[in-house]
Regions:
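Conserved beta-strand-loop-beta-strand element in the redox core of flavoprotein oxidoreductases
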Residues: 123-139
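Core beta-strand elements of the Rossmann-like FAD/NAD(P) dinucleotide-binding domain
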Residues: 2, 135-144
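Short alpha-helical segments and helix-capping/turn motifs at coil-helix boundaries
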Residues: 11-15, 100-102, 129-134, 176, ...
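Redox-cofactor binding/interface segments in oxidoreductases and associated redox assembly factors
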Residues: 7, 134, 147-148
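Glycine-rich nucleotide phosphate-binding loop and flanking beta-alpha elements
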Residues: 13, 140, 152-154
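Beta1/beta-strand and adjacent pyrophosphate-binding region of the FAD-binding site
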Residues: 1-12
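Conserved N-terminal/central alpha/beta ligand/cofactor-binding core
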Residues: 18-124, 144, 148-168, 172-177, ...
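C-terminal catalytic lobe of FAD-dependent flavoproteins
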Residues: 253-294
C-alpha cells in the first residue's frame, strides 16, 4: 500500500513524487519505461518570458526543475533585459541527457519506488480512488493517486495531415485511462503545441545568420549553493523569413492540420506556429526564426 502513487514521471510527476517523499510518505512513481523520468519533450528549453519566474518559484519550494536546468544548461539567456527586473525572463537551452540524468540523480536520493507499466484504469470506491490497474493486470493500492500524465492522455500527433495516436514522438498514448476518466465525468480539453523541425547543422550556412551567444554572466535558476559541473556553452542563431517564404506557406496552407480543420486543441497564446504568424500578421515582411542546439 502506497501513501502516494504518481502516474507519469515528467516534470510534474517527479516534483510530486519528491515532495511527497520528503514529507515521509511511501511513494510509487509509475512510467511507461524505466528511463522516462525527466525526459524532455518538444523543445528542450526551460523558462522564458512568463515562465522563468515560475521555475524560480518552484525552487523556493525546493523543487527539482531549477537545479536540473542549471546542471544541463548549454545556452543561457536573460530575456527582456531592456526592461525592469520584474519582467526579466531567465531561459536556458538544455542538453536532454544531462537534464534527465540530473532529475534521475535527485530522485535516487529519496526512497521512491519506481514502477514500469501503463496504468489502464483507476479502482474506485465511490468517489475515492483506492488503487490503479496496470496493463498486465497488476493492482497497486494507494491512499492517494496523482495523475501527472502530461501530453499522454489519449494524445494525437500530426505530421502534416497524417494523424497518429502518440503521447510523444515514437511513444504510445494512454488511451484506456483517458477513456475511463471521460466515463466518470471528468472534464477534458485538448491543448495544442507545435514541435519545431530538426535541421542538420552541417547543412546550414551559419556565417549568414546572426549569432546569439550565451550570456557572459553564468546566472542560475536555483538559489541552492551547490557546485555545478562545467558544461560547454553553445551558440544559438537568428534568421528571418522572407516574402518568398510567406508566399510558399500561403500556397501550402491546405497541408497544415491547423487550417485543414484537424486540430481541436487550443494553441499557445504567445507562441503561434509560423503559418499562423503569416496568416495573422501577413503585412510584415519577415518573422524571426531561432536556431537552437539540440
Amino acid at each position: 500500500m502506497f501513501d502516494v502513487l504518481v502516474i507519469g514521471s515528467g516534470h510534474a510527476g517527479c516534483e510530486a513524487a519528491v515532495a511527497a517523499a520528503r514529507r515521509g510518505a511511501k511513494v510509487g512513481l509509475i512510467s511507461f519505461r524505466p528511463n522516462d523520468a525527466g525526459q524532455m519533450s518538444c523543445n528542450p528549453s526551460i523558462g522564458g518570458v512568463g515562465k522563468g519566474h515560475l521555475v524560480r518559484e518552484l525552487d523556493v519550494f525546493d523543487g527539482l526543475m531549477a537545479r536540473a536546468a542549471d546542471r544541463a544548461a548549454i545556452h543561457r539567456r536573460m530575456l527582456n533585459r531592456s526592461k525592469g527586473p520584474a519582467v526579466w525572463g531567465p531561459r536556458v537551452q538544455a542538453d536532454r541527457q544531462l537534464f534527465r540524468s540530473a532529475i534521475e540523480l535527485l530522485l535516487q536520493s529519496l526512497p521512491i519506488e519506481r514502477i514500469v507499466g501503463e496504468v489502464t484504469s483507476l479502482r474506485l470506491n465511490g468517489n475515492e480512488v483506492v488503487a490503479v490497474v496496470l496493463g498486465d493486470g497488476t493492482i497497486i493500492k494507494a491512499r492517494s493517486v496523482v495523475v501527472a500524465t502530461g501530453t499522454f492522455l489519449d494524445a494525437r500527433t500530426y505530421l502534416g495531415l497524417e494523424c497518429r495516436s502518440a503521447g510523444r514522438a515514437g511513444e504510445r498514448s494512454a488511451i484506456p485511462l483517458a477513456a475511463q476518466m471521460r466515463e466518470v465525468g471528468l472534464a477534458a480539453r485538448r491543448l495544442k503545441t507545435g514541435t519545431p523541425p530538426r535541421l542538420d547543422g552541417r547543412t546550414i550556412d551559419w556565417a549568414r545568420l546572426e549569432e546569439q551567444p550565451s550570456d557572459d554572466e553564468a546566472w542560475r535558476f536555483s538559489a541552492h549553493p551547490e557546485h555545478l559541473p562545467s558544461v560547454p556553452q553553445l551558440r544559438c542563431a537568428i534568421t528571418r523569413t522572407t516574402i518568398a517564404t510567406h508566399d510558399l506557406i500561403r500556397k501550402s496552407e491546405d497541408q497544415s492540420p491547423l487550417y485543414a480543420g484537424l486540430i481541436e486543441g487550443r494553441g499557445p497564446r504567445y507562441c503561434p506556429s509560423i503559418e499562423d504568424k503569416v496568416r495573422r500578421f501577413g503585412d510584415r515582411d519577415g518573422h524571426q526564426i531561432f536556431l537552437e542546439p539540440e
